[in-house]
Amino acid sequence: PMTNFDYLRDIEPLHDLYTFCQGAEATMDSDHDACALHCRRGLEWLVKAIYTLKNAEIGERKSLYELMTGEPFVVFLEDDRLITAAHYIRKVGNIAAHAGGVKSSEAYFCLLNLYNLVGGTLLKLRVLTSLAPFDKTLIPKNGPRITPRETVPAPVRQFVESVPAEAVGSKTPAPIVTEYSEFETRKLFIDLMLRDAGWELVGKDNVAMPNKAGTEIEVHGMPKQDVGYADYVLYGSDGKPLAVIEAKRTSKDPVIGKHQAELYAQCLKDQYGVLPVIYYTNGFQTFVIDGLGYPPRQILGFHSQEDLLVIHRSR
């Protein structure tokens, strides 16, 4: 049967990459943790390949995170969406490797992100001239269990030598092969960032619970229509809001969410007597206003409950 990564099968120098991608797709339905690990191995191969092509030093002890935030990788992709997609795979891969318990939606999104990363990279490197969007109907049901490999081999010389130098140094961003659905993408990225910071979602809209992250929380006192709905509110153990998160369309500048988030924060302050820390994000870029008098700054993830308490106490 056809799979999404079949196109790699006959490209001999990409045999290792094909193994990782194929393993990820085969286990997506049957073993979410394994799928996430296969995706992470594929990502690691890709990152190392980009460094090798750029003659950049990988270094013995550099972590995947260090390589991914390094200039060779970031400048090569030149697209916030793909960089965020790569970090998504890295983070879910970490969950799979340590605690386990990757969800079906997370495994699927890892696979989709891997497809876009591999495709975008190979198109930019002119290894491919075209690639169809990801087709989720091709994912095998109850696929075989394939144990992820422990190590990631270096890209073979044959591959490195086959790529034209001008493609490696090209300023053109790597293309996006499969468009992300706005809502799904934003939600999956934000939910993972919350999970990463130790926040548990309530699981039902407009429910405020101590120590949990509530979604679509009704707030009163908004200008014009009085009632508004905050995308996420993070509650402390006393049931008061520690933070509010406003998510805007990924295609929009996240600053559009800033004004909205500030309005929600003010309404929550009027209700609870405490001003929440403000986050606004488009899923790919996230900013915080901590209420300590600093201008908004970009961050890689949300604060944990403890860190938010520290911010509140420092005011």
Question: What name fits each language-model region?
Answer:
Residues 123-315:
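ATP-dependent helicase/translocase motor core
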Residues 1-155:
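Amphipathic alpha-helical interface elements
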